Amino acid sequence: MTNIRKSHPLFKIINHSFIDLPAPSNISSWWNFGSLLGVCLMVQILTGLFLAMHYTSDTMTAFSSVTHICRDVNYGWLIRYLHANGASMFFICLFLHVGRGLYYGSYTFLETWNIGIILLFAVMATAFMGYVLPWGQMSFWGATVITNLLSAIPYIGTTLVEWIWGGFSVDKATLTRFFAFHFILPFIIAALAIVHLLFLHETGSNNPTGLNSDADKIPFHPYYTIKDLLGVFMLLLFLMTLVLFFPDLLGDPDNYTPANPLNTPPHIKPEWYFLFAYAILRSIPNKLGGVVALILSILILAFLPFLHTSKQRSLTFRPITQILYWILVANLLILTWIGGQPVEHPFIIIGQLASISYFSIILILMPISGIVEDKMLKWN
């Protein structure tokens, strides 16, 4: 009799995705982040569900309801901080996952890569709306500043912003709709993640060499299930350390002050994972130009497959592009630091230089180095 996991219509899909899936024998720990993102998403949906049971999306009671969760609900503080810091873990895994794709040329899987970019935008939108929900000072002013950027769109801008707000300012209607979207988006993200996986399994995984690995495949289970499990335990250990010892490390103290439309905080800034994009936005003096640069800072990922000039897929054997890659990583860290600094000298010029070098490395220097390396190998 055929094994049920190979014959049952439902189990068969799971079997082909997580058990009998042929995987390259040499994929490193950089390939762990896909499964870790799945774990992060599950943690966020579960903790979010329990938070939603006690949260009220009304401007008068939102802040109090979060306080109530932390003080009166059994383990409410734990659920709240797991959710808040879980978002940070989500973004750490996301950035490492994208960075891995960039380094090893995984962007040549076009469909998988493009769904990934849509996922990145969806997660960023979800995180932004989630940050508004506690209705603290930074929640309110962050929502005001970021939604206001849409007013830079010619002709329809102002109307669009008022339509999103549901009035003439960020108010009750805005909070209610943000809660609704924040609740539904993670389920859309989960569906998109399945599509992401579906496209990946059409081609099979990439590997550190960037070469075809059809000749050397191993079953996903037990090899990579146990490897992923180790990653999951390490992730949870890191998350729990953050939650139990430093719960407010990555948060903003201003968000412990209830939202007040009459009092602007001295420094309006988003959560740490948006700071690099925020720095790029601020480095352009023109409003519309800043918005375009902000969107392009992420959307530039979609151009990567067309900017690939090398005959090699991965950066493993390409030392010049490797150097550029790590300069790009350092550059992003500088942008993250600048995004959290006030708009004054010398931070303005540092941010502008870092923004220029960010786009230059991706659009100009990396494609040139790909051609140069091919020339050095006499492959051209």
Swiss-Prot record:
Membrane-crossing residue ranges in chain numbering: 33-53, 77-98, 113-133, 178-198, 226-246, 288-308, 320-340, 347-367
**UniProtKB keywords:** Electron transport, Heme, Iron, Membrane, Metal-binding, Mitochondrion, Mitochondrion inner membrane, Respiratory chain, Transmembrane, Transmembrane helix, Transport, Ubiquinone
- One Pfam family name from the record? Cytochrom_B_C
InterPro entries reported for this sequence: Cyt_b/b6_C, Cyt_b/b6_C_sf, Cyt_b/b6_N, Cytb/b6-like_sf, Cytochrome_b, Cytochrome_b_C_euk/bac, Cytochrome_b_N_euk/bac, Di-haem_cyt_TM
A GO CC term?
protein-containing complex
Q: How does it assemble?
A: The cytochrome bc1 complex contains 11 subunits: 3 respiratory subunits (MT-CYB, CYC1 and UQCRFS1), 2 core proteins (UQCRC1 and UQCRC2) and 6 low-molecular weight proteins (UQCRH/QCR6, UQCRB/QCR7, UQCRQ/QCR8, UQCR10/QCR9, UQCR11/QCR10 and a cleavage product of UQCRFS1). This cytochrome bc1 complex then forms a dimer.
Indicate what this protein is called per its UniProt record. Answer: Cytochrome b
What organism is this sequence from?
A: Rattus norvegicus (Rat)
